[in-house]
Amino acid sequence: MAPKDSQVSASNEMTGNPPSSVQGRSRNGCITCRIRRVKCDEERPHCRRCQSTGRKCDGYTPLTGQQPKQQPPQQAAKAGSSELRIIQHTPQVTQPTQLCMFPGVDTLLTEDEYRALEFFNVQTVSCFGPRAGGWLLNAACQDSAIRRAAMALGTMHRVVLYHSRTPPHDRRRGMQLALQQYNSAIRQGLKLFAGSNDSSADGILSMCVLFFCLDSLQGHFRSALRHVGSGLRILAQRQLRGQRAENTLLPPDVIQSLFAALEAQMLEIDGQSPLLDENGLPVRGAGRPAPLWTLEEAQDTFRSIYNDFLRLLSFSARLEEPVDELEMVQIVEQVMARKQQVQTDLDAWSLEFDHFLAHIFHWGNQASQQSVRMLQLWRTMLTMVLHMGWPPQDTAWGSHLSELNIILDLAEQIIVMSPPLELESSAGSTFSLQGHSRAGSPSGSRSRSMSTSSSASRDDSPTTTTTTTTTPTPRLKKETDPQSTYTPILPRPFHSSPSRFTLALGILPALWTIATQCRDSSVRYRAIDLIGRSKRREGVWDSDLHFRLALQLARHEEQAAGLDAGAEYTHARIPPEARVTLNGRFDEGRKAKISYIRENVRVGEEIFHW
């Protein structure tokens, strides 16, 4: 029996109707577009379509082995019924290829899905640190729900990182794609709640981390913090059961490290955490790590001490509550005991850290040097605050200007050491700082970001963290949209690529504290300047938003003190009755309600949008 295509061709010839001519999408396009059978824009010497998708344009040299010239329709009609035409469809991807970058993924992916997962690997995993990022990528390759969440985060991160270089219609399409993947991940994640094994719990915890990052990138900070609370409550239940997790997607110490960073976000912003018991004291972890052998261990150990410090600040607020004398004595004893414990832990860590820097650490990698500067910055900050008297008073900051300048010097070094963010053009800040000196600060408002991931990672990280220098051929289900364009993805350099988003210990909380607590104009405005120039988002800490808030607070205090704009002043020029405290809360969406309080009286209120 003749093939169906043969019957159609023969029937056409018998009736005298000319057969339809099979043509490619591009006759005069470049070789690459002709092979892919997509429309070429015929830009020379290299077409923009190939460049926008990260492909190499092979130029316009004719393909070898030209197809025979087709007969005119009149000659084809006279050819007779004995002529047989075989019409064969050639798919865009001739043969599915194995995903070299993601060998654990055994399902077919669309181009959008592959590009999202590729971007997650090349750019996004560095935001979690080398070890945690590797384990999250490994979990995404093994679990479909986590993989879908990783795709959504990769797509959203790509939209944010390339925002200024992407046309508006492509940005809208990227946002829509990220939200579609986000909703799909939520639907798949709901199925994990039905499971009772440790793998299901790990999947939920991993998705809480990824969803937090995705909502933070969108600017939905209240929703992001809710994901943190959900994950911390799951961890608290695990701790109460006292069961050791087995067959997990992520090692327990990796989960602990990730949620220590997320808990710090809740404590810094809201002063609350689900891991606080009824007395407001922390539910302590399983113990401190061993003596420091890697920079990442130093970061994890310090993070534990830093979170205890934040819990201490939160609980110390009870000292201002009206209670009877006996209860107040008990609260004071608890606070001072907790403060002494934090001080002891910090002193012990400092000795270990100094020994690590002197005898183990090698100063070779710029990203590692940034991480060391970050730890030195926060050690100085915590040591200074713990020696102010407890709880710290507004008047105490004026006597620690030397330590504050050391902290600002370290923050400046971190920003200057960061590679320039070439992926995005510099954008000026919303407000200007005219009239205020920026002692020790480089001029201009360079847009920079920083990466604090350690170069020294443990050997038990999953092998999927290794990045090849070339992009593997994706195993595609179909090409979703011939008109869609993709910004080229470059191989990750030896140290992590600059990223506008990170979960690592950052500079913004320290700079914000100095900008709002210190009333020396040179120190205050240098801190505000560094916030604006950092161009960075550390979880829910957004440099642009907090730059606006810090500048607004400073101007409120200066106006109340009768100071002209741009005037230099010391602590004494801002009396207590002119000082302002911010009481803010993130609302749903991209806004926050900010109240300005002076001497326990609300003097103003404002809604901030971003």
Swiss-Prot record:
Pfam families documented for this protein: Zn_clus
Role: Transcription factor that positively regulates the cluster that mediate the production of aspercryptins, linear lipopeptides built from six amino acids including 2 highly unusual and nonproteogenic amino acids, 2-amino-octanoic acid (2aoa) and 2-amino-dodecanol (2adol).
Cited CDD domains: GAL4 (cd00067)
Molecular-function GO terms, alphabetical: DNA binding; DNA-binding transcription factor activity, RNA polymerase II-specific; zinc ion binding
Gene Ontology process terms (BP): regulation of transcription by RNA polymerase II
Region (Disordered): 1-27, 61-81, 427-493
Protein's UniProt name: Aspercryptin biosynthesis cluster-specific transcription regulator atnN
GO cellular component: nucleus
Superkingdom as given in the UniProt entry: Eukaryota
Localization, UniProt: Nucleus
DNA-binding region(s), residue ranges: 30-57
Comp. bias intervals (Polar residues): 1-26
Main location: nucleus
Record bears the keyword Transmembrane helix: no
UniProt cross-references to SMART domains, sorted A to Z: GAL4
Alphabetized UniProt keyword annotations: DNA-binding, Metal-binding, Nucleus, Transcription, Transcription regulation, Zinc
SUPFAM superfamilies: Zn2/Cys6 DNA-binding domain
Biased composition (Low complexity): 66-79, 437-474
